[in-house]
């Protein structure tokens, strides 16, 4: 307790986190892209290489997963306007939201129905390519749909993949690995939903269940993989490859906006709200967005009040040296995908200058917004995916934030607010009914 009091004396906002209050923190250390980029340790060239790799795999994905064929084997999600939801939020919160609200439907991405279809699938493909190239079975000029042949399945079956997950990352890595032919083990934390485990098992994936939280599942997965030289551990806390898989979203969104005739520039700012668990997904996407839109995009991470690991780490500067449990928070939340007690130190340090802020919201708030979105727009998401939905109202309510960035009323009126919906497209009907019943 004494340590917590000392921490609060130095970092007053910790008091609100401990009290589980919905909290908004605008980052005083935010810099321009030019100043912040060197700290990421990755470049636009790295993201372009990831983009090219996904293009090489597109013919394979189009055949392996027919639902991706129409898009030519590219796994990408729609951007839709949600005007009725915007009005509903204004009414519920008594707060005008200037500009236009859009929803990025990663919740409905092909193959695994979440944002993790970006990073998780990309890292599995990267590993498969590396093994096949090293074995001389493939060149980068080949048509990668040859990977569907029995010879390749046989080759990949000598190797295994392991990952620790609260659910969605395990789902994307498990399904993709099993399809390639890898043996795959997913170490699931206590928060993981039963249907996600069942789906993985139906694909022939080994699921190891823990009574503990995410950190323990990752640690156990890492340990199990160390004893097997043919086992590759996908490390959600530290993986640059996962991060780059997410970062590809930036250029893709830029192309989608161009197609829609949507302008993003100094007088038409873009605000993006990303749900955050350990940080890899939102961190990678935010990095890609910064490369695509520069200083005209403003990124915010959203976390449950019971799992504010990234806000705690970045705000105190302690990063992965502190967990929410250290300040007496239980890390128990209905937003199972965000139930992480200790943030990625890699992501926190890489992105702390490129984030405009972080905020927390209550589980009940997520349930309420889940219900409103279903009623107003007919779109159904899982609780985690609603974390970003509270963002626009927080920004529009903060005159201090607007003044610090010198936003005029005209700029705010021209703004685009993009809510990144991270998952929910594959939630079973009965489970979704339970979610909807919890909204007010």
From Swiss-Prot:
Record's protein name: D-serine dehydratase
Reactions catalysed: D-serine = pyruvate + NH4(+)
An annotated Gene Ontology molecular function: hydro-lyase activity
Enzyme class: lyase
Keyword Flavoprotein: no
Organism: Salmonella typhi
Cofactor(s) essential for the protein: pyridoxal 5'-phosphate
Signal peptide: none
Quaternary assembly: Monomer.
EC number: 4.3.1.18
Gene symbol of the encoding locus: dsdA
Gene3D superfamilies named in the record: 3.40.50.1100
Family designation: Belongs to the serine/threonine dehydratase family. DsdA subfamily.
Keyword line: Lyase, Pyridoxal phosphate
Biological processes per GO annotation: D-serine catabolic process; isoleucine biosynthetic process
List of residues that carry N6-(pyridoxal phosphate)lysine: 116
């Amino acid at each position: 307790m004494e340590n917590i009091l000392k921490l609060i004396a130095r970092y007053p906002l910790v008091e609100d986190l401990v009290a589980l209050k919905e909290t908004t923190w605008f980052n005083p250390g935010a810099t321009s892209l030019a100043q912040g980029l060197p700290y990421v340790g990755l470049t636009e060239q790295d993201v372009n290489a990831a983009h090219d790799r996904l293009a090489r795999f597109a013919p394979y994905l189009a055949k392996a997963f027919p639902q991706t064929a129409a898009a030519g084997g590219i796994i990408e999600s729609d951007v839709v306007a949600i005007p009725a939801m915007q009005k509903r939020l204004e009414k519920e919160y008594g707060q005008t939201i200037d500009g236009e609200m859009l929803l990025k439907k990663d919740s409905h991405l092909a193959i695994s129905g979440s944002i993790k279809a970006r990073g998780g699938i990309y890292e599995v493909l990267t590993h498969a390519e590396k093994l096949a190239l090293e074995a001389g079975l493939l060149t980068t000029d080949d048509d990668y749909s040859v990977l569907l042949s029995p010879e390749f399945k046989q080759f990949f079956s000598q190797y295994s993949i392991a990952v620790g997950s609260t659910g969605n990352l395990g789902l994307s890595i498990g399904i993709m690995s099993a399809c390639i032919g890898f043996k795959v083990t997913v170490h699931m934390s206590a928060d993981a939903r039963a249907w996600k485990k069942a789906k993985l098992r139906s694909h022939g994936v080994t699921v190891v269940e823990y009574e503990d939280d995410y950190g323990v599942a990752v640690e156990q997965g890492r340990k199990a993989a160390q004893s097997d030289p043919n086992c590759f551990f996908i490390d959600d806390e530290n993986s640059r490859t996962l991060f780059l898989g997410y970062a590809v979203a930036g250029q893709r969104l830029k192309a989608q906006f161009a197609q829609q005739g949507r302008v993003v520039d100094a007088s038409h700012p873009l605000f993006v709200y990303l749900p955050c668990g350990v940080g890899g997904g939102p961190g990678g996407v935010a990095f890609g967005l910064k490369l695509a839109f520069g200083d005209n995009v403003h990124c915010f991470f959203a976390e449950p009040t019971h799992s504010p690991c990234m806000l705690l780490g970045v705000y105190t500067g302690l990063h992965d040296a502190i967990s929410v449990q250290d300040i007496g928070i239980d890390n128990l939340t209905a937003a199972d995908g965000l139930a992480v007690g200790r943030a990625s130190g890699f992501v926190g340090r890489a992105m702390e200058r490129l984030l405009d802020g972080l905020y927390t919201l209550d589980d009940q708030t997520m349930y309420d917004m889940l219900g409103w979105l279903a009623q107003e727009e007919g779109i159904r998401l899982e609780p985690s995916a609603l974390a970003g939905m509270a963002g626009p109202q927080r920004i529009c309510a903060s005159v201090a934030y607007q003044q610090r960035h010198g936003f005029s009323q005209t700029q705010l009126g021209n703004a685009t607010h993009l809510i990144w919906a991270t998952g929910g497209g594959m939630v079973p009907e009965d489970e979704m009914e339970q979610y909807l019943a919890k909204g007010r």
